[in-house]
Every structure is written in C-alpha cells, then in structure tokens.
C-alpha cells in the first residue's frame, strides 16, 4: 500500500452515467486502519487463537467513533480485498453503494501486496477466496455501516439475502464464534427496529420465521460449543418473547436450556440476568427477580456505553424492592448520571414509604408515559396494595383501636369492606399484629413480641451468609490464573512475539454492544 496516493480513487464503471468522470476518494489513513484490523484477524486463521478476533471486535467502537465506516472506504477495501472471481464481492458492493459496478484502478497490484494470510484456496471451485474470518468481519462492517446510516430496510434485506444464507449457513468453523454472535445481534436488532418504526402486514410472519431460524442456529451453536453465539441467541430469543408479551413461553424456554457462563462476555451475562429478573418479577417471584437484577448490575460494564442499561436495571431494581416491601436508601437515587432517570421512582418510593394513596395515584398518573416507556408500568401499578399496607401499618402503630370507617377515610378507600379485606391481608402477611372485630367494625392491635424471640434474625443472617458465599464462589470462578512467567517468556521468544497480552476479561468487557439498544428501550 506504500505506492498508493494519499487520496485513493474509486471510479464508476456505469455506461449510462452522465457523471462517469467524477471520482469518489477514500483516504489512505482510513483504509490502513481497516487493514490493521484485518491483519489482526488473519492471525486467528493462522494460530486458531480467538484472542485476535477479540481485539479486532474491541476496535469496532473506535472505528465507528472515527467515522471510518463510510461508503468510500468500504467500497475501496472490498474492491481491492476481494478478487473479481469472488462470489461475495458483488453482494457487498451492492449494499455499500447504489452503483455496485464501481472499480478501483490498479486493484490487482494492490491486492498482490496484501498478506497471503488474507486468502484461502477454494478446492471445489479452484478459485482464491478471502478467508472465512475476514469475510465474515467485512460483512459485519457493512452491517454497522448500514445501521449507522439508518438504512434499516437495506440492512434487513442484506441480512435476509446475504448474511444468513451465504455466511451463517455456509461456514462451519469454530473460529467464527465471536463474529457470528455479533452478526446475529445486528440481524435481530435491525428486524426489531424496523418492525417498531413501520407497521407491516407480514411483520408477524417474518418474526416467526426469524425466531425459528434463531432456534435452529441455537441448536447448532450448542452442539459446536460456541458459547458466545449460544449466549447471544438465547438473549435475542428471550428478548423476542418479552417483546411479544409471551412471558410463559420465555419461562418454559429458560427451563429447557443451560446458559453458558464460561467464555462469555459480561455484557451478555448482564443482559441475560436482566431478562430473568424481568420474567420472575412478572410471575410474582420477587425474591428471585431481586437476585437476578443485582447480578445484572454487577455483571454489566460500568462505563458510558452501558449507562442506558444500568439506568434501566436500577429502575427495575427499585420496583422489585418496593414490591418486596423494602424501601431503597436515599443514596440509591443519587447515583452518578441517574438522578434524572430515577426521579419518577423516587416519588413513587416516597408515596409507598408514607402510605399516601392519594400521592401514589397522582404520581402514577403524572409519570405514566415514562413508566410505559420503561416497561415498568404494570409493576408499579401492583404497588397500590403495598401503599395501602404501609398506611395500615402506620395507623396500627399510632392507634391501639380504630374503626374500619376511620381507616377508610384516612386512606381514601372505596368502602369499609375494602378496608376489611386489606387489613386481613396485612395481618396474614405479617405486616401488622392485630385482630378484627367484625361485629363492631374496628381493629385492635396486639402487643408486639420481641423480634429476637422469632426466627426473623436467623433468616436475615442466613440470607447474608448465602450472599457472601455466593459472591466468594463467583469471584473464584472469574479469577484468571496466569501461567509461569518463564514459560510465557520462552514461548514469546520462540514465536517472536513481543506484544503485550491483554486479559480476555478486559476484552470481553470492552466489547459491549449494549449502547446500540439504548434508543429502543431495554425491556
């Protein structure tokens, strides 16, 4: 590439093009940056070490931030990288630019200067093709280009006609595990976004077809032990179930599979725990949902890219805590970059804490649209009974004996029968210690027993011990045990490698694609 000009030209070969003499230029620096990433991927082809693909996928965010994924750069790279005999070249150019007959002068000479590790020999057709790893990565770059360009219809068509049949159904290599996971992410993301933005008649049929296709490839990924692809497909299928309100189907789906917790990026695990928490919260299992949402917040990368996910997770965590009868601490609502997003939930918490049913109703009405957008409205509506129970508890602590009618007036309830029912539930749930006199229509609180004579302290300490043991076990599993330094130095000297190794865990954290979901809202 040293012989190329600073601005490399891409000529149009259209016959009827009135402006065929015009040229679009691709900057050499941008092309060189792409070639560096491709060169890193080619090392995986030679060594079968997936760390190089991890590093390349980590560089995707910087490529997008620097706007290197533009039509001119991609068009030039595809024209030079792919031989004219390649069956993938035409399809890529077709979706990058409207005129897929564009060409690069001297592309053959430039191609000859590329490393031989970029190419492989197709024994069946007896032609030279780009290696599977680089080919799939180039298709991923085109996906990102169409996504960033808001070309959703073209992206869906590209996925349906090119990516799924020509890549995912064609290649059968374990080295493609990481790239395939990314490809599936943007396949489903583009489908979901287009379905939300446009009301198509056949959207339900297309959704069923896509879900069945993901189920099919989930079986293949499980058999091949492609953990990253398997985890990605499980998350996407769960997201699809929840998008369509099929909570029971999602629960059955989870019960019939085993999620891979090894060799999986932390962002995928965080998303999986979030979905599990959502499902359990809808099914009234709040204690299990609370455990999963705490795990999701801990697993998620704590950086600017995952801010939207962390905000949504904390909103769900607040709702679950309130439904469990717990009140979040004030510091919970003052976390950095979350004060504004958690403001509606702060007012809800305040209403629940005071047992003020009137304030609770006005807060729900005021922030209804925000709660619907967060998909927590139904959970927040369930808090009405908690508000009433809290109000009854405050009243029982204040009065030794009080009539049901007075409670009805204080809590603004409909009738005395409603009050009697709610007080009965509060007594059953252990919220208050009281007796109801049905004949005279009043309740009488009893003396509170010494709490240390009950089993409550034992249960609290048991929960704390279990949490500490679970945290200890998870840290042991996630620890990296480095090899002997002498062995590493000997291997590096033999292979001639002097570059610093990066921990796989760091690469997994930085490879998060959570930020692309922020605009959609996180279930």
Curated annotation (Swiss-Prot):
PTM field: N-acetylated by NAT1.
Keyword set, alphabetical order: Acetylation, Phosphoprotein, Proteasome
Region described as Disordered: 480-523
Residue stretches making up the PCI domain: 270-450
Any GO molecular function: enzyme regulator activity
Comp. bias (Acidic residues): 496-523
Superkingdom per UniProt: Eukaryota
Phosphoserine: modified positions: 454
Modified residues (N-acetylalanine): 2
Annotated GO biological process: proteasome-mediated ubiquitin-dependent protein catabolic process; regulation of protein catabolic process; ubiquitin-dependent protein catabolic process
SMART domains xrefs: PAM, PINT
Biased composition (Basic and acidic residues): 480-495
SUPFAM superfamilies named among the record's database cross-references: Winged helix' DNA-binding domain
Assigned GO CC terms: proteasome complex; proteasome regulatory particle, lid subcomplex
SUBUNIT field: The 26S proteasome is composed of a core protease, known as the 20S proteasome, capped at one or both ends by the 19S regulatory complex (RC). The RC is composed of at least 18 different subunits in two subcomplexes, the base and the lid, which form the portions proximal and distal to the 20S proteolytic core, respectively.
Family: Belongs to the proteasome subunit S3 family.
Misc. remarks from the entry: Present with 16700 molecules/cell in log phase SD medium.
Function description: Acts as a regulatory subunit of the 26S proteasome which is involved in the ATP-dependent degradation of ubiquitinated proteins.
Protein name (record): 26S proteasome regulatory subunit RPN3
Name of the gene encoding the protein in the UniProt record: RPN3
